[in-house]
Amino acid sequence: MKRVDIKIGFNCNNKCKFCVQGNKREHYQNKSINEIKEALYKAKQNELTGVVFTGGEPCIHPNIIEAVRYAKELGFEYIQIQSNGRMFAYYDFCQKLILAGANEFSPALHSSQEQIHDFLTSNKGAFQQVVQGIKNLKKLNQYILTNTVITSRNYQDLPALAELFIDLSVDQFQFAFVHILGTAAENQDWLVPKKSEIMPFVKRGLDIGINAGKRVMTEAIPYCFMEGYEDYIAEKIMPETQVVDAEGVIESYSDYRWKLGKEKRKECENCRYFNICEGPWKEYLEIYGWEEFKIIK
């Protein structure tokens, strides 16, 4: 599958302390429905088969239903809504999205503990809305793949969060290490944990999902931390993605990660995973350096 990721606007009803988009909401207006349709049409002409509506928070864009409907009319097979999940708490809104053509939903839940999730999203009540949203979508028989951003404040809770995902019957969950850009960069002194410290909790969380028969993934955690869990590295199966952003179009997000976003050192050439490992985000190395990373023979 090849897909297009369209950031339809940067307005948001949360203000996450790890947000990679930072203050873009203050500088960029929503894309108009015509701009969204143009991006969808071009993507379809280029034979892309999937679309992810994201942002910002796509569910508060005034034309989200029309945009989804147009994607369906064009014949996109996979129409995903990547969201903080709060609007999914409204059952009728979920119904409208599904009727328009959405068939994958990716809400974000960052802790099994209400106070931690609400703290990280800067929004009291957000946890309850996301949980209700997942319940609504399951009642409507939708495919749910959640995303959790790993930070210093929630990594110890990952096993309990995995248990909650099982209880909520999500289809897939992913643990993604924080990308230190935007608001995350502003908070990096207290927000960013060492990868070596999080791994026991990440692996316990993965085990819980694996044992329950769920699809589980990690993102932005290199192979040298994932011994025995190499099959659960998201980058190895990520579809080729075009990103339509405020500043322009990234034709290949994979190329961006490999050539600009992430980094490997000379010693990595001796690792068995050198040709398939992307390495860590560059910003992580500026904080902690290479000491934790090792060569896998």
Regions found by a protein language model. Give the residues of each.
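Radical SAM/AdoMet-radical enzyme domain recognition
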Residues: 33-52, 61-177
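Cysteine-centered iron-sulfur cluster-binding motifs in ferredoxin-type domains/subunits
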Residues: 8-15, 57, 264-268, 274
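A short acidic, helix-capping loop that chelates divalent metal ions and anchors anionic groups
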Residues: 25-27, 114-120, 182-188
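Radical SAM enzyme [4Fe-4S]-AdoMet core and its adjacent flexible, acidic
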Residues: 123-128, 132-135, 139-256
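Canonical Radical SAM [4Fe-4S] cluster-binding loop centered on the CxxxCxxC motif
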Residues: 2-35
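Flexible mid-to-C-terminal extensions adjoining Fe-S/redox cofactors in radical SAM and related proteins
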Residues: 230-297
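Residues that line or immediately flank small-molecule/substrate-binding pockets and catalytic motifs
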Residues: 23, 55, 83, 109, ...
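Short glycine/serine/threonine-enriched helix-capping/active-site loop
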Residues: 1-4, 107, 175, 218-219
